[in-house]
Regions:
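Conserved catalytic cores of very large enzyme subunits
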Residues: 1-194, 211-489
């Protein structure tokens, strides 16, 4: 590990140990794939219900709502959890605690609804090969709850309160036009219900913070007050907003947030610059906030890592790398962690010293860093119809997928085995695992007199697999999933 030069302590050993035990006990067995089923330290019981009590309450509420629209069911169950979960404002942490984080809503929402969506999709398209593709290792088609990215720009400029106001204003405009549908009315009502519950939750956190007198309490209280009333004002406010949104979306509503900001450096930079210029916080204090923020994701232990990205290019061609980009790398290196994982958007305008810094970190042991070729991202998105500006500002998410900011929705997950179509060329479309015809009939391989014809047959097989695999999702899966979630992503 290459030592970075901080002449101040980023996080005390006591606080670090505390956060490392916030989500699960370090001295107990742990399965990262089941990370949300654990708890670390105990929360104040007076702040809310236990997990079991909340699950019993959800059972009772879901029973009352069983004949209601999915929008209504989801929004009411979501609100119930935020109203009743235990909370924490701790002397060892700058970030809030939410106790019930095991997606307990799933029993009544995602679990039954996705089965319903698959059944309806299969019925709509007839004899779908989706199950056979899965059994044979050819392809997998699933509803995707794991690759969402919220509109961080709107959240950073409006906050939770401003998003709700924008929703109400949009509703008023559509309502006054006389063109609003019954379904739109219901969607508005339920989306409003969820954002009101979220704001109420933040107000509950704020009220609880006022009962604390430890050194961090005043800073936490002021930040929560900002988020109760409007948009984030400081770097710390924005970090707290990102964290709260992440926990509520990922662990309550079951939509994984697969990027922390539109580039963590670029989302935070306006706040960072303002904080320094107006002397709200020093660089040292901001460094600590970022360190405590990163430690949350390290401590959660997500087995596939929590991503965020840095760098990139502005539409005018200038680099998006800034002072904070370097500082974030330094903090990450100093902490010696591998989760969250960092994606760096690189192109010709990326400063070489920034790339070399990341490379030195990798050589020194900070190996959870990947480089994403921005030129390829831009070309690929523009081929799909995106403008240059939109493609340049594309968000990197998940492993290292990319998408347009606030203009795309990733709700279907399709994975393909590129070798299977090759097998189908040799077998005439028959699968050697299931014994079924999963491809198409093509000529016997011995009849091909050129590689080009062989390759054309391969592409034909692959094209068939792709279209058969995505057909159920195109037919019904998307509509059903949108029926599940009134909270926009």
């Amino acid at each position: 590990m290459q030592e970075r030069f901080f002449n101040y302590e980023l996080i005390s050993d006591t606080d670090r140990s505390f956060i490392e035990n916030k989500y699960h006990r370090q001295d107990m067995p742990f399965d990262g794939k089941q990370r949300m089923k654990y708890h670390g330290y105990d929360y104040d019981e007076s702040t809310g219900l236990s997990d079991r009590e909340i699950m019993l309450g959800l059972d009772e509420l879901a029973k009352k709502l069983e004949n209601e629209h999915h929008y209504t069911i989801k929004s009411e169950l979501f609100s119930y959890i935020l109203d009743n979960t235990r909370i924490d404002i701790n002397e060892h942490d700058y970030f809030i605690g939410i106790y019930t984080w095991d997606r307990v809503i799933d029993k009544h929402t995602i679990d039954p609804w996705q089965k319903e969506a698959y059944a309806k999709a299969t019925l709509a398209v007839g004899n779908s090969k989706r199950n056979d593709f899965s059994k044979s290792g050819t392809a997998w088609a699933l509803l995707d709850f794991d690759h969402t990215v919220p509109d961080w720009e709107s959240l950073s400029t409006l906050g939770f309160v401003g998003i709700l106001e924008r929703l109400e204003n949009s509703y008023t405009v559509v309502k006054s036009s006389g063109s609003i549908t019954e379904k739109q009315e219901l969607f508005y009502k339920c989306a409003k219900r969820e954002y009101e519950a979220l704001i109420k939750f933040v107000k509950r956190l704020y009220a609880y913070s006022l009962t604390k007198s430890h050194p961090k309490a005043a800073i936490v209280s002021e930040s929560l007050k900002h988020l109760c009333e409007g948009a984030p004002q400081t770097t710390y406010d924005m970090l707290q907003l990102i964290y709260i949104y992440f926990m509520v979306s990922e662990s309550v509503e079951h939509y994984q947030v697969r990027s922390l900001g539109y580039g963590l450096d670029n989302t935070l930079y306006p706040f960072y610059k303002s904080d320094i210029e107006n002397r709200r916080f020093s660089k040292e204090e901001i460094s600590r906030f970022i360190a405590y923020f990163m430690m949350q994701f390290s401590a959660m232990g997500n087995y596939w890592g929590q991503p965020f990205y840095l760098g990139g290019t502005n539409p005018d061609g200038s680099t998006a790398v800034n002072e904070l980009s370097y500082l974030i790398l330094d903090i990450y290196d100093k902490l010696g962690i591998y989760n969250p994982k960092i994606q760096i958007k690189v192109c010709k305008s990326t400063p070489k010293d920034f790339v070399f810094k990341a490379l030195r970190m990798i050589i020194g042991g900070s190996t959870s860093i990947v480089f994403c070729n921005e030129d390829i991202i831009v070309k690929a998105l523009m081929r799909s119809g995106a403008t240059y500006d939109d493609a340049t500002l594309a968000v990197v998410k998940g492993c290292y997928e990319y998408a347009l900011r606030a203009k795309s929705i990733g709700i279907s997950f399709n994975t393909f085995n590129a070798l299977k179509p090759l097998c189908f060329v040799f077998s005439g479309g028959y699968d050697n695992v299931t014994g079924k015809l999963l491809g198409i009939h093509t000529k016997d391989v011995s009849e091909f007199d050129s590689f080009e014809k062989f390759y054309h047959a391969y592409l034909a097989q692959f094209d068939y697999v792709i279209n058969e695999n995505i057909l159920p999702g195109k037919s019904h899966g998307r509509r059903s999933l949108l029926g599940c979630s009134p909270w926009g992503h």
